[in-house]
């Protein structure tokens, strides 16, 4: 495996490689693989910018009617589960921590307020995730705290405050 060199954007293939442990190296953060990978691309990632000036990520998921969750949630009334959008935001905070060069496996640690004000239907075209890093702790504890927004076809529909993700060198007792 080659040494990791951070990019400012990532393709679906690169995100799947991350899920297979090929991006950040063995024992380090991984994204889920399909079907739980809720991203098709990271359009932009930076240690600057965002609402707090501490970093941001913009990622996208292309929507099509044959996505796995539409067939079971709910029959006759298909909608993307809101928890999958929330999980995508946690996925992105963990990715950010590893992208900055921090070691360890990512685990979601919680969030503050979460609001759902809309839905993602199979007729939608694209979901956009926008993560605004508020704080990045890089000591013995490696943790990111961020606010996130989810939009469908340009309309904001979810908001999460204080998303927390940590990276751990040992998850045996987690």
From Swiss-Prot:
Subcellular location, record wording: Cytoplasm
InterPro entries, per database record: FabA, FabA_FabZ, HotDog_dom_sf
One Gene Ontology term, aspect cellular component: cytoplasm
Gene3D superfamilies (alphabetical): Hotdog Thioesterase
Domain of life according to the entry: Bacteria
EC number annotated for this UniProt entry: 4.2.1.59, 5.3.3.14
The family this protein is said to belong to: Belongs to the thioester dehydratase family. FabA subfamily.
Function (record text): Necessary for the introduction of cis unsaturation into fatty acids. Catalyzes the dehydration of (3R)-3-hydroxydecanoyl-ACP to E-(2)-decenoyl-ACP and then its isomerization to Z-(3)-decenoyl-ACP. Can catalyze the dehydratase reaction for beta-hydroxyacyl-ACPs with saturated chain lengths up to 16:0, being most active on intermediate chain length.
Subunit structure as annotated in this protein's UniProt entry: Homodimer.
HAMAP family: FabA
Protein name per the record: 3-hydroxydecanoyl-[acyl-carrier-protein] dehydratase
Organism: Teredinibacter turnerae (strain ATCC 39867 / T7901)
Gene name linked to the record: fabA
């Amino acid at each position: 495996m080659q040494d990791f060199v951070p990019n400012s954007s990532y393709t679906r293939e690169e995100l799947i490689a991350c899920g297979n442990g090929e991006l950040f190296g063995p024992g380090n953060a991984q994204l889920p693989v399909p079907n739980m990978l809720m991203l098709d691309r990271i359009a932009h990632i930076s240690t600057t910018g965002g609402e707090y000036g501490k970093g941001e990520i913009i990622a996208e998921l292309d929507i099509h009617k044959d996505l796995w969750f539409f067939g079971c949630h709910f029959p006759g009334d298909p909608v993307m589960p809101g928890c999958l959008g929330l999980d995508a935001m946690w996925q992105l905070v963990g990715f950010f921590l590893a992208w900055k060069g921090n070691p360890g496996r990512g685990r979601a640690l919680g969030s503050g307020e979460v609001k759902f004000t809309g839905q993602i239907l199979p007729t939608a075209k694209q979901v956009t995730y926008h993560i605004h890093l508020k704080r990045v702790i890089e000591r013995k504890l490696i943790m990111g705290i961020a606010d996130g927004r989810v939009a469908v076809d340009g309309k904001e529909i979810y908001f999460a405050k204080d998303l927390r993700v940590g990276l751990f060198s040992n998850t045996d007792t987690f």
